């Protein structure tokens, strides 16, 4: 009789089985963070647009 052994464990790629879900979650978090930052910039521009433009021009537009 042949002796067969089975090893139960993970394959090299198995530990990242849920990676697409994680990547989607991280992408959404990054997008939300970017949206929040843009909203904050919009708010600053609405309240201090003239000052923002003045300081931007003083720095040479860079």
Curated annotation (Swiss-Prot):
GO BP annotations, alphabetical order: modification-dependent protein catabolic process; proteasomal protein catabolic process; protein pupylation
Quaternary arrangement and interactors, per the entry?
A: Strongly interacts with the proteasome-associated ATPase ARC through a hydrophobic interface; the interacting region of Pup lies in its C-terminal half. There is one Pup binding site per ARC hexamer ring.
Query: Quick check: keyword Glycoprotein in the entry?
Result: no
Q: What is this protein called?
A: Prokaryotic ubiquitin-like protein Pup
Entry GO MF terms: proteasome binding; protein tag activity
Q: Which InterPro entries match?
A: Ubiquitin-like_Pup
Please give the Pfam families that the UniProt record associates with this protein: Pup
Q: Write out the ranges of the annotated region (ARC ATPase binding).
A: 18-56
- NCBIfam families xrefs: pupylate_cterm (TIGR03687)
Tell whether Phosphoprotein is among the UniProt keywords: no
At the top level, the lineage of the source is Bacteria
UniProt gene name? pup
Chain positions covered by the region annotation Disordered: 1-36
Species in which this protein is naturally found: Corynebacterium kroppenstedtii (strain DSM 44385 / JCM 11950 / CIP 105744 / CCUG 35717)
Q: Could you describe the post-translational modifications of this protein? A: Is modified by deamidation of its C-terminal glutamine to glutamate by the deamidase Dop, a prerequisite to the subsequent pupylation process.
**Keyword terms:** Isopeptide bond, Ubl conjugation pathway
Deamidated glutamine-modified residues are where?
62
Swiss-Prot/TrEMBL puts the cross-link Isoglutamyl lysine isopeptide (Gln-Lys) (interchain with K-? in acceptor proteins) at 62
Q: Which family does it belong to?
A: Belongs to the prokaryotic ubiquitin-like protein family.
What's the record's remark on domains?
Answer: The N-terminal unstructured half of Pup provides a signal required to initiate unfolding and degradation by the proteasome but is not needed for pupylation, while the C-terminal helical half of Pup interacts with ARC to target proteins to the proteasome.
Show the stretches that span the lipid bilayer: none
Q: In which pathway does it act?
A: Protein degradation; proteasomal Pup-dependent pathway
């Amino acid at each position: 009789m042949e002796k067969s052994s089975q090893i139960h464990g993970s394959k090299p790629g198995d530990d990242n089985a849920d990676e697409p879900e994680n990547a989607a979650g991280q992408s959404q978090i990054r997008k939300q963070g970017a949206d929040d930052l843009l909203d904050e910039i919009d708010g600053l521009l609405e309240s201090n647009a003239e000052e923002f433009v003045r300081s931007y021009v003083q720095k040479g537009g860079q």
